[in-house]
Design a protein with these regions (language model features):
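C-terminal beta-strand-rich structural cap/linker in extracellular carbohydrate-active enzymes
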Residues: 62-85
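Beta-strand-rich modules
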Residues: 164-184
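Conserved aromatic beta-strand anchor motif in extracellular beta-sandwich/beta-rich domains
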Residues: 40, 141-145
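Short beta-strand segments within Ig-like beta-sandwich modules, predominantly Fibronectin type-III
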Residues: 53-55, 153-159
Length: 202
C-alpha cells in the first residue's frame, strides 16, 4: 500500500483540476517477477485499476503510473486481485439491482403497435455504470390480458424497448419488464418484474 499526499503549505492537495500526477514507486520485493495491478478505492468503495508500466532504472525495477488525484494505492498480484475485484463487482451489481427502481411505459407507434420501454428511475447512469464493469445488460418483456396474473414472456433483448405487433385488435393488454445482468452467459443479478401502471389496447 502507498499513500500519496501533496501539500502546499499546510493544505493537502487531493484533486488536480484536470491535471495529472506522474508517480514512480519501487517494485515490492515479493512482487518482483510477477504480473501486477495498480489499484485504488473509489468513492463507492470499489477497487479500480490504473494503467501502469514497469521500468528498470539501474539494477532496480519501478512501477510508473499517472493519476488525476491522490489516494491510497496498492500494488497487488494480478491473479489474486482480479478474482477479488470480480467478486466485489458482482456483489455491487446485485446490491444495485435490489435497490434500483425502474419505470415501464407503453406508447402507440404510427402503425398502431405498442412500444414498451423500461428505464432506470433511480439513476440515469446506473445501466452504463454496470456495463462499464464489463457486464452485459438484457431486458425481458412480458404481457397479459389480466393486470395481476397470467404474464407470459414475449421477448428477451439487449435493447430497453420492444414493439409488440401481435394481439387481438381492440383488446387491452398489460405489460411488465425486468432487467437482467450477465457476466458472459452467467446470470449475475436481475430486477423484480415492474409493471406498467396502465394497459394498452391493440
Amino acid at each position: 500500500l502507498f499513500d500519496l499526499v501533496a501539500k502546499i503549505g499546510e493544505k493537502h492537495l487531493h484533486q488536480f483540476e484536470g491535471g495529472k500526477a506522474y508517480v514512480i514507486l519501487p517494485m515490492p520485493d515479493k512482487l518482483k517477477g510477477k504480473d501486477i495491478l495498480v489499484i485504488y478505492i473509489d468513492d463507492n468503495g470499489l477497487c479500480k485499476i490504473l494503467n501502469h508500466s514497469v521500468v528498470k532504472i539501474g539494477a532496480e525495477y519501478y512501477i510508473r503510473f499517472t493519476t488525476p488525484h491522490f489516494s491510497t494505492f496498492a500494488v497487488v498480484d494480478k491473479d489474486e486481485a482480479e478474482g477479488l475485484i470480480k467478486e466485489q463487482n458482482a456483489a455491487h451489481v446485485k446490491e444495485l439491482m435490489q435497490s434500483a427502481k425502474f419505470k415501464v411505459t407503453t406508447t402507440k407507434t404510427s402503425k398502431k403497435s405498442v412500444k414498451v420501454q423500461v428505464a432506470a428511475k433511480s439513476s440515469k447512469t446506473m445501466i452504463s455504470d454496470i456495463k462499464s464493469l464489463g457486464y452485459t445488460v438484457k431486458y425481458q418483456f412480458y404481457r397479459s390480458t389480466k393486470k395481476t396474473a397470467g404474464y407470459k414472456l414475449l421477448k428477451t433483448s439487449s435493447k430497453n424497448s420492444f414493439i409488440s405487433t401481435k394481439g387481438t385488435k381492440g383488446r387491452k393488454y398489460y405489460y411488465k419488464a425486468r432487467v437482467l445482468v450477465y457476466d458472459g452467459s452467467k446470470l449475475v443479478a436481475r430486477s423484480a418484474l415492474k409493471q406498467c401502471s396502465y394497459g394498452a389496447r391493440r
